[in-house]
Amino acid sequence: MKKLFLVIVPLLLSLLATSCSTSNVPPPTPLAEKPPKEAKVKVKWSRKTGNGNGGLPIYNVSPTYANNTVFVPNQNGVAYGLSITDGKIVWKHDTGTILSSQPNTIANAVIFGSVKGVLTAVDQKDGKILWRTDAPSSIFSQPTIYSNHLYTHTHDGSVTSFDATNGSKVWNVTNNIPEITLPSDSSPIILNDTVMVGSAFGTVLGFTLESGDRTINLPVAIAHGSSPADKMVDITANPMLYGNYLIFAAFQGAIVALDKDTGKMLWAKKASIINNMAINNGVIFTAQANSELKAYDIQTGDTVWTQSTLEWRKITAPIYYKGLIVVADYQGFLHFFNSLNGDYLGRYKLTPKSDFFDYGISGQLVPTEKGILIEADSGTTYLVDAHSDRVIYENILGDYKVNRGKNVKFIYPLEQPKSGSIESSPKALPDKKVDSNKTSKNDTDSNPATTATSTKDIQNPANQEMINSTPVSNTSTKAEKNENTDSSIAEGVVTSNKVQPTPKGKNATIIIGDFSKGDSD
């Protein structure tokens, strides 16, 4: 099955490119001949870390940083450990597989994911393998670390829990996916003992930490349109938890803020977001699918500022660094904006020109207290510092924090376990296959977009709010069950506890319910 999926992925990408080619995408906005020069940039070091991808990014890999070491995945399969001080190679290790995601760290281990679905944990000091295990499918998103466990959201829709100390599988849940998806996935987020992910159907799914039982299936957007590409509402941006606000964003759908405890919609705005978001001081920074930058007030969803200077320039996810919002583009330029008002402060050409084209930057920029880590499509990794005298800032990295739970301090190689060093892993539970369009056996008339557990249900309230320019028919029909597609999500709009016909048009409908836990009625 995994081999078949690896064959299908390039075909789907080809179909997606063909579909998008007919949508008359505008050309990239030309850069100004005389840009502002209010940003001061210093390249601290650069290091060749492989051959890159020939300027044709498919898997947008990016580095991570811990314990004064930069860990760099390469699409040629080689993992690097670099000194954060000068970029010198501390170690390198050939994993034998195409690395396709940003790695993550726990204790002394750094964990890499690959397009073949292989997870490899190596020692941060020397790159020696600690353990290796198989995930269900391609890994395009950074694995999530929480309390000695590793959670993955793979490209076939599966959500899997592993023991991070030895790689053993704890549980796995398979989920449906549409016929065409974006070549990326959202990372899981842990909240209230629940593993939450954004799905390719534009829904928020939640699973219990211990066993993977599904407790949440909350639609964020409904797909409209005639072609598979028009119907895409993938949630590929990582969800973010900031104070009481849980933020999700969908492609061709919406950005929404939910109450972290109840799931109640606090606000929702039409948007089309693919890349990750950044947050600082109560403001969410996003790059729309057309490369427009937009900042939102996290309390109200109101637009703080919009910046269209870089429209259609295929920019990376925005990051916050020293009061600046920084993005890179397909020609290898870094662009700098004032985080307070969106003013464009200048650009810097980071990557060299080749004889045929400019090597771009498509992977996630990584802000650290030492500088911004950048892995260019050419295969070179950089550490860059930047600031502007026009911007006053308090924190280098902003105030967004991720809860990683409580983790072990050291992981020993699986081949040579130390006595008492690794607790026996939980007995792996059987894989669960979840058909996200099916209702509970005991609740066939309940909301088809919500699946109940054995003891507690998550229900959408009857007074759901929705944002939709087209009126919805008042005629209710029950969702049809289908083993291969999520008809209750892709074919209709959920209102109260029924499914109604989808209104015509290509704009997605935003629909929100609660995921507050309570006994079923």
From Swiss-Prot:
InterPro entries: BamB, PQQ_b-propeller_rpt, PQQ_rpt_dom, Quinoprotein_ADH-like_sf, WD40/YVTN_repeat-like_dom_sf. A lipid is attached at residue 20 (N-palmitoyl cysteine). One of its GO terms (biological process) is Gram-negative-bacterium-type cell outer membrane assembly. CDD domains: BamB_YfgL. It is found in: Cell outer membrane. Its main location: membrane. It holds the Pfam family PQQ_2. Residues 429-444 have a biased composition (Basic and acidic residues). Residues 1-19 form the signal peptide. Residues 445-477 have a biased composition (Polar residues). It comes from the Bacteria. A lipid is attached at residue 20 (S-diacylglycerol cysteine). Gene3D superfamilies: YVTN repeat-like/Quinoprotein amine dehydrogenase (2.130.10.10). The keyword Ribosomal protein does not apply. It is a lipid-anchor. SMART domains: PQQ. Residues 418-521 are annotated as: Disordered. Keywords: Cell outer membrane, Lipoprotein, Membrane, Palmitate, Signal. Part of the Bam complex. Belongs to the BamB family. Part of the outer membrane protein assembly complex, which is involved in assembly and insertion of beta-barrel proteins into the outer membrane. This is Outer membrane protein assembly factor BamB. It comes from Francisella salina. The gene is bamB.
